[in-house]
Amino acid sequence: MKEKIVLAYSGGLDTSVAVQWLIDKGYDVVACCLDVGEGKDLDIVYKKALDMGAVECHIIDATKEFSDEYVSYAIKGNLMYENAYPLVSALSRPLIAKKLVEIAEKTNSVGIAHGCTGKGNDQVRFEVAIKALNPSLKAFAPVREWAWSREEEIDYAIKHNIPVSINHDSPYSIDQNLWGRANECGILEDPYAAPPEDAFDLTNALEETPDAADEIILTFDKGIPVQIDGKTYELDDLILTLNALAGKHGIGRIDHVENRLVGIKSREIYEAPAAEVILKAHKALETITLTKDVAHFKPIIEKQFAEQLYNGLWFSPLTDSLKLFIDSTQQYVSGDVRIKLFKGNAIVNGRKSPYTLYDEKLATYTKEDAFNQDAAVGFIDIYGLPTQVNSMLHGGYSNEQ
């Protein structure tokens, strides 16, 4: 009896070629495809996997689990790698790895294969997660092992009658899920080349966006968006709704050269319409619901959390601890944020919360002012005392210092 290998199967070039390669190596291939909100026709993927020679194909709808257990932390933690990338692909990898391990254990497979190259981040994310969840499973990386170029893969697919949706003229590598869309390769590898419009799918070009703005009210409950204009949604449906609405206005395009875990720089084109709107609104709500010290410290945790996720360390003690901290900050992050969507911009123009720490009577400069300005004199004396003592001891500061 042949040994079984579970393959993370997407139906794209890398994994379609990998099926044939694993079969040639003498394995039975168990294909596994997850739906994490990308809108892919999974019936076609299922049929294609079997047509390619897989002995089984498991289709798993993990969209709700993805939104509730993973995207929720991206929102509560305002997660952005290098202050630019909302972790579109990185966010889905630990969930995919988890499901692959479950299928491998269910089918008595000896290992798990993926279609990642040897120069990308995903190989690390998948294999580190798999080792954390089940160290006895072997990892197989066909694309990394054969070290083919993208052009050689395409030629191999053509030679073996493997249907793929890309060609030499449009060799994009695309990954999409509920939280957004990532695109690389082809002309995008030149960091000075303007991305052509065929590199985008979720967002309109600015020239094609409406000339009238849409204004929405996004309601949050403990850090999670739950309503648009008073209508309640499950998180996954809310994100899909915002993707369509914000994408219509050209919101969420990101052109970023990022520092990969493996040490190289990579130019990526991302589309994340809902993510841009939600994260801006969430940050705005936090400005009135978090205390100053938490508001100043939380970004430090957010940066570390984003790097943990980007670097494939979701299943780690540190990440578990970071999640607990993030959760503890969100107890009172509830309320409404008003946002205008227009010509590529998500503009926050109002926020309110039953737990607001903003006191208008303390902030106002009108006659309603309740702030005790006399208290400022003593505060300044105490606050500036260390500087004053230092200056007296060392003779003060000159303009040259």
UniProtKB/Swiss-Prot annotation:
The keyword Amino-acid biosynthesis applies. It catalyses: L-citrulline + L-aspartate + ATP = 2-(N(omega)-L-arginino)succinate + AMP + diphosphate + H(+). GO terms for cellular component: cytoplasm. Pathway: Amino-acid biosynthesis; L-arginine biosynthesis; L-arginine from L-ornithine and carbamoyl phosphate: step 2/3. L-aspartate binds at T117, N121, D122. It holds the Pfam family Arginosuc_syn_C. ATP binds at A8, Y9, S10, G11, G12, L13, D14, T15, S16, G115. CDD domains: ASS. The keyword Cytoplasm applies. Its EC number is 6.3.4.5. L-citrulline binds at Y85, N121, R125, S173, E258, Y270. InterPro entries: Arginosuc_syn_C (IPR048268), Arginosuc_syn_N (IPR048267), Arginosuc_synth (IPR001518), Arginosuc_synth_CS (IPR018223), Arginosuc_synth_type_1_subfam (IPR023434), AS_cat/multimer_dom_body (IPR024074), Rossmann-like_a/b/a_fold (IPR014729). One of its GO terms (molecular function) is argininosuccinate synthase activity. One of its GO terms (biological process) is urea cycle. It is found in: Cytoplasm. Keywords: Amino-acid biosynthesis, Arginine biosynthesis, ATP-binding, Cytoplasm, Ligase, Nucleotide-binding. Homotetramer. Belongs to the argininosuccinate synthase family. Type 1 subfamily. This is Argininosuccinate synthase. It comes from Staphylococcus aureus (strain MSSA476).
